[in-house]
């Protein structure tokens, strides 16, 4: 499986401002490249804290082009993703360490292997993604 990390930081090496704001620390060209990266992967993976703080859509949007949308994946050990989240619809997979409960129209699966902190272990996450037909994931 191909795993790609996309990361943006400010000049001082931070990923958010002192007040916790993290939206738009990059410019338009970098955001477009981020959407190209999204379109080039089978899945986009975020943690539940990103969902709670940013409520992202996690879609690939390229001007003038229609693209197949990647599977949206949320690592959510305690199943805190709100049913009202923008990504709590179809084409979303939530991987959790607790008994699965409905979250909007998203698929929710328990990942059996957990790390010492009670979170899904990365090898188990990759195995679950592979089982979902994912060959490449953008983090």
Language model features with spans:
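Gly/Thr-rich phosphate-binding loop signature of adenosyl cofactor/nucleotide-binding cores
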Residues: 139
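Active-site ligand-binding patch in enzyme domains
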Residues: 2-11, 15-136
């Amino acid at each position: 499986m191909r795993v790609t990390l996309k990361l943006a930081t400010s000049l001082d090496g931070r990923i958010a401002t002192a007040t916790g704001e993290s939206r738009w620390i990059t410019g338009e060209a970098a955001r477009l490249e981020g959407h190209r990266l999204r379109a080039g992967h089978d899945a986009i993976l975020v943690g539940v804290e990103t969902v709670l703080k940013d409520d992202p859509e996690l879609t690939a949007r390229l001007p003038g082009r229609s693209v197949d949308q990647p599977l949206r994946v949320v690592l959510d050990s305690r199943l805190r993703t709100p049913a009202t989240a923008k990504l709590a619809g179809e084409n979303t997979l939530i991987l959790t360490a607790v008994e699965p409960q409905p979250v909007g129209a998203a698929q929710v699966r328990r990942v059996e292997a957990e790390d010492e902190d009670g979170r899904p272990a990365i090898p188990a996450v990759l195995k679950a993604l592979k089982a979902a037909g994912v060959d490449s994931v953008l983090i």
